[in-house]
């Protein structure tokens, strides 16, 4: 006979846990084929515009035969195109982002406020949310007469940036509880991107504590040289931080003092307006 402990163990073994979003699913409800197909799509990125069968297999952990079948299926469905050697994403993939941006509340209500900030200052603003290792741009504005040769990061919707090296990402991490912060660091070791990037866990946790205490984050050249940024939290229901509002600018155009003295109050006021709407 099974003991209660054995029965509990069996039940636990049938539950899958997603360490990134904390979701759970029963094993019998999990469709491995969909998971593998999405793993193929996830293998593409801003630094990987094309994949061959070998690269796809290495990125996903599949066999070459399995990777080939999934690539060919996605090509058949219209999400990939191939030149005979490499596979590329097609515009059809944008239907998912379009559906999200058209239906999600935060991007829609943020956009006019971001546009107003740009009209007032001719600087670039965005709203970002945390997704695992990265912060994702879900709304943004761009100065109409931006002429700087430096092209700061985070200028297009859907752009994904390492959370530990950006002002918005650090805001989002700062408002996680201590356990969640430690879990994040355990799962995503701090990678050096420039000589200014934080790579020591103790120093980084201390920084997150300071950011939460002051309620805003300034970041300079931690992700990209010649670029600095400022971010504040956006609160949703139950006083929970749901996103970050930030400004990104070339260091040759604005100073740290200007951002903190003149732009920070505008960010804080806009974040308050968004909180009232949300």
Swiss-Prot record:
The keyword Transcription applies. The keyword Transcription applies. Keywords: Activator, Aromatic hydrocarbons catabolism, DNA-binding, Transcription, Transcription regulation. Residues 31-91 form the HTH iclR-type domain. Induction: By protocatechuate. GO terms for molecular function: DNA binding; DNA-binding transcription factor activity. It holds the Pfam family IclR_C. It comes from the Bacteria. It comes from Acinetobacter baylyi (strain ATCC 33305 / BD413 / ADP1). Coiled coil: none annotated. Residues 53-72 bind DNA. The gene is pcaU. Gene3D superfamilies: 3.30.450.40, Winged helix-like DNA-binding domain superfamily/Winged helix DNA-binding domain. PROSITE patterns: HTH_ICLR (PS51077), ICLR_ED (PS51078). Residues 106-278 form the IclR-ED domain. This is Pca operon regulatory protein. Activates transcription of the pca operon. One of its GO terms (biological process) is positive regulation of DNA-templated transcription.
């Amino acid at each position: 006979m099974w003991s209660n402990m054995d029965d509990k163990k069996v039940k636990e073994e049938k539950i899958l846990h997603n360490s990134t979003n904390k979701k759970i699913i029963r094993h019998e409800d999990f469709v491995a084929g969909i998971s593998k197909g999405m793993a193929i799509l996830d293998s593409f990125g801003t630094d990987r515009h094309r994949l061959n069968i070998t690269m796809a297999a290495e990125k996903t952990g599949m066999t070459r035969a399995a990777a080939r079948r999934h690539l060919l299926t996605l090509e058949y469905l219209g999400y990939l195109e191939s030149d005979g050697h490499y596979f590329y994403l097609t515009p059809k993939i944008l239907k998912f982002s379009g559906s999200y941006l058209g239906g999600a509340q935060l991007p829609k209500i943020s956009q006019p406020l971001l546009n107003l900030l740009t009209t007032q200052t001719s600087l670039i603003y965005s709203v970002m949310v945390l997704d695992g290792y990265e912060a994702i741009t879900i709304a943004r504005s761009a100065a109409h007469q931006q002429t700087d040769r430096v092209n700061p990061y985070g200028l297009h919707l859907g752009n994904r940036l390492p959370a530990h090296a950006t002002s918005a990402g650090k805001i989002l991490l700062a408002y996680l509880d201590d356990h969640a912060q430690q879990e994040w660091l355990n799962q995503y070791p701090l990678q050096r991107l420039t000589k200014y990037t934080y790579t020591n866990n103790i120093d980084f946790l201390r920084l997150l504590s300071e950011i939460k205490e002051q309620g805003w984050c300034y970041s300079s050249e931690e992700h990209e040289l010649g670029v600095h940024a400022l971010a504040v939290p956006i609160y949703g229901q139950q006083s929970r931080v749901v996103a970050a509002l930030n400004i990104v600018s070339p260091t040759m155009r604005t100073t740290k003092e200007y951002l903190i003295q003149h732009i920070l109050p505008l960010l804080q006021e806009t974040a308050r307006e968004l909180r009232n709407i949300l």
